[in-house]
Amino acid sequence: MAELLLVETPIPQQKHYESKPFPAVISPPSASIPIPALSLPLFTQTIKTQKHYLDSLLHESGAVLFRGFPVNSADDFNDVVEAFGFDELPYVGGAAPRTSVVGRVFTANESPPDQKIPFHHEMAQVREFPSKLFFYCEIEPKCGGETPIVLSHVVYERMKDKHPEFVQRLEEHGLLYVRVLGEDDDPSSPIGRGWKSTFLTHDKNLAEQRAVDLGMKLEWTEDGGAKTVMGPIPAIKYDESRNRKVWFNSMVAAYTGWEDKRNDPRKAVTFGDGKPLPADIVHDCLRILEEECVAVPWQRGDVLLIDNWAVLHSRRPFDPPRRVLASLCK
């Protein structure tokens, strides 16, 4: 089979760090290839043959957006994910309500469209988190609904410069995450995943064992729900592949977004010694995240590959319809 030429394409929303674009954007050569020849099998075959180049690009930039390729369905997206050859990571221990779609593909966080999902590294609050994640736009929103991304080491450096004592405390004590789960999923909440979905079982004994495997403490509540305590776990990690520290946590997400009828966000995350976080510094971190982020409006067929070690992501509110799918990789 012929191989497709991959073209690095500039878009207005990109930022540049050390002369490298963020995110990198890859498109087909629009002028040289007739549209009928631009098939999904050709795209997936090119991914396989150009894997070294794409891995290098992801390592340099932290995120790669594939735009203009014939990825028209969840099945197509699953084929794209499979073409990269990354091992699958089951979604066990995460907070977001999600629905399995096909193969390795499930819905992105299904919280209501008027709610913002704050910046976080995917599953930063558990031991086993994905190293990479894919997003795919099946239905582009009428308005809003971007998935802003931000380079984690940039956030770390800015926080260290502005709040050195706070960062030192984080490095010494880590963070403690507390979440109260219902028995079943609550689609009205951005963290509404019930314990049955969280641990992929209806058996409490098995749920307890899986919690232990994840490093969680699990307590059952009188209403049939559960309380999970995770940590202390590091809030700042060292990215060995890039030789730099990264702001690898869900601090802002938990403190500003883990709120529903069961959860108080101010109690959802604390220093690892249990002491409360200073609200003004948390909100200043949010400001830094917003200043440094890139928000590219989704287009139907877009596939976004994120290095979860390098990049935090979020979701902006939107006017429906919008359907963005996801896949996690070890």
Swiss-Prot record:
UniProt GO molecular function: metal ion binding; oxidoreductase activity
Binding site for Fe cation: 120, 122, 313
Keyword flag Cell inner membrane: no
Domain of life the protein comes from: Eukaryota
Residue(s) carrying N-acetylalanine: 2
GO CC list: cytosol; nucleus
Keywords from the named record: Acetylation, Iron, Metal-binding, Oxidoreductase
EC number: 1.-.-.-
InterPro entries from the UniProt entry: AlphaKG_dependent_hydroxylases, TauD-like_sf, TauD/TfdA-like
The keyword Acetylation belongs to this UniProt entry's keyword annotation: yes
Free-text comment on the cofactor: Binds 1 Fe cation per subunit.
SUPFAM superfamilies membership: Clavaminate synthase-like
Top-rank EC class of the record's enzyme: oxidoreductase
Cofactor: Fe cation
Extra facts: May use 2-oxoglutarate as a cosubstrate.
Protein name (record): Clavaminate synthase-like protein At3g21360
Organism annotation: Arabidopsis thaliana
